[in-house]
Amino acid sequence: MSFNIFIASDHTGLTLKKIISEHLKTKQFNVVDLGPNYFDANDDYPDFAFLVADKVKKNSDKDLGILICGTGVGVCMAANKVKGVLAALVVSEKTAALARQHDNANVLCLSSRFVTDSENIKIVDDFLKANFEGGRHQRRIDKIIRYEKETE
């Protein structure tokens, strides 16, 4: 593939991260695992969220990110603090597609506790299959970007 998928999690998402990484590699995606590589109950999700978000922002029109924590909320909040990142917490296949089609999300945030591994795989697949539709949706994204610049 001509783009990277950066993936990371906290300790609660470690197993799911490995499952998703292997799934994507079998589909020939270029997956870059940013950690963790071992279980550490004291790790902090913002550290991994910032790693992925910083990588995605460098090539935000191509590269994508996947972040995992217990709820998906924490990594989503942290990733959205990085300028140029549009992170979406997704818990269903339908919203996975819409996050890309309508919101041009470039970071997918997943819950390892409240969504099954198999459902998360479907969410990832639908997210990656979808493309941004532009049009009226671009106007809305432009407003977000403009506000981000105005409030620096």
Curated annotation (Swiss-Prot):
GO terms for molecular function: ribose-5-phosphate isomerase activity. It catalyses: aldehydo-D-ribose 5-phosphate = D-ribulose 5-phosphate. D-ribulose 5-phosphate binds at D10, H11, G70, T71, G72, V73, G74, D103, R113, R136, R140. Keywords: Carbohydrate metabolism, Isomerase. It comes from the Bacteria. The active site is at C69, H102. GO terms for biological process: D-allose catabolic process; pentose-phosphate shunt, non-oxidative branch. Pathway: Carbohydrate degradation; pentose phosphate pathway; D-ribose 5-phosphate from D-ribulose 5-phosphate (non-oxidative stage): step 1/1. Its EC number is 5.3.1.6. InterPro entries: RpiB, RpiB_LacA_LacB, RpiB_LacA_LacB_sf. Catalyzes the interconversion of ribulose-5-P and ribose-5-P. Homodimer. Belongs to the LacAB/RpiB family. This is Probable ribose-5-phosphate isomerase B.
